[in-house]
A protein has these predicted regions:
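C-terminal coupling/interaction segments
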Residues: 2-12, 281-319
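Conserved structural motif at the start of ABC-family nucleotide-binding domains
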Residues: 29, 44-46
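Conserved ABC ATPase "signature" region
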Residues: 34, 121, 125, 131-146
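Conserved ABC transporter NBD signature motif
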Residues: 75, 83-97
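Conserved ABC ATPase signature
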Residues: 149-156
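Catalytic Walker B motif of ABC-type/P-loop ATPase nucleotide-binding domains
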Residues: 174-178
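ABC transporter nucleotide-binding domain
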Residues: 192-281
Length: 319
């Protein structure tokens, strides 16, 4: 397999750094040429990453792409072999020590034998200007479990406690590494509602996730890394427009499904019973060909592809 291309594929018109940082505000994250290896294994191979203050950015990539390593560098737990990284103009360790950064890391443990309310009080005491206790509990939706032991919660409840611990100091930047991995669908929806309430305060969020629908719904911008490098950077809509086939969906009432693949613009045909989805490079041409085909159909709908399909095509094109 060929090595991953080194230049990120543009997915939107670049926005000047000066425009993003109007008023002279420091960018939340500025990283250039980050390289990190673990013995012979290369985790990052020259990653550049800029995140403006107030943005919500999703960090996507296949397993082993370097997402967790990137977050480890941003919280100062790791040090790059090469390259530079600053968080609000400071080295990451100084930004963390100054209370500017909160983080939810994968598999972070919770103190055994301590009740949730006690844990939150202890964590708040570590910061000079913590969130008020009532606001912290409300943001993390922890009221019903304050009296329970932190080590006896469900996976989703424990993640909400980790979220509360991460925001207890009212950080300007919140780093999330697979934050909803232990949650069911409803718990994930509730969690992102909590994140939206937090970002409404002007806070910055960078999150890594394997749930691409979360990135589509929650992120202002998506950064895709593969092979330790950035391969795409743009809004979810821009990435879907660049890499995702448009779709023509309808119910096939009569006619041979074999004719569908030959319609103009059709790249692939997906069927779920009588419901058909045509992935098309030119939906106008596909619809016109469908009308001329003699097939009987109903319930026509034309729309964009999803971020997951775009992500898979992007990875295929950059490997």
């Amino acid at each position: 397999m060929a090595s991953a291309r080194t230049d990120p594929i543009p997915t939107s018109q670049p926005e000047p750094e000066a425009a993003r940082q109007a008023g002279g505000e420091q960018p939340a994250i500025r990283a250039a040429g980050l390289a990190k290896s673990y013995g012979p294994t290369v985790a990052l191979a020259g990653l550049d990453l800029h995140v403006a203050a107030g943005e919500t950015v999703a960090l996507l990539g296949p397993n082993g792409a370097g997402k967790t390593t990137t977050i480890g560098l941003l919280v100062g737990l790791l040090h790059p072999d090469r390259g530079q990284v600053q968080v609000y103009g400071r080295p990451p360790s100084q930004a963390v020590a100054g209370g500017l950064v909160g983080a939810m890391l994968q598999d972070a443990g919770l103190m055994p034998g301590v009740r949730v309310g006690e844990l939150l009080a202890m964590v708040r005491g570590l910061y000079p200007r913590p969130l008020p206790p009532g606001e912290l509990v409300a943001l993390a939706d922890l009221g019903p479990v304050l009296g329970r032991r932190a080590d006896r919660l469900s996976g989703g409840q424990a993640q909400r406690v980790r979220f509360a611990v991460a925001i207890a100091g009212d950080p300007r930047l919140l780093l999330l590494d697979e934050p909803t991995a232990a949650m069911d669908v409803q718990a994930r929806r509730n969690f992102w509602a909590q994140i939206h309430r937090y970002t409404a305060r002007g806070r910055t969020v960078l999150f890594a996730t394997h749930y691409l629908q979360e990135a589509d719904d929650a992120a202002d911008r998506v950064v895709v890394i593969a092979g330790g490098r950035k391969v795409a950077d743009g809004t979810p809509a821009a990435i879907k427009a660049r890499f995702g086939d448009q779709q023509v969906r309808f119910t096939l009432l009569q006619g041979s499904p074999a004719l569908l693949a030959a319609l103009d613009g059709v790249r692939a045909v997906d069927r779920d019973g009588p419901r058909v989805t045509l992935r098309s490079s030119d939906t106008d041409a596909t619809v016109a060909a469908l009308v001329r085909s003699g097939l009987r159909w109903s319930g026509l709908d034309v729309g964009g592809g999803d971020l997951e399909t775009s992500f898979l095509r992007l990875l295929a094109e950059t490997s």
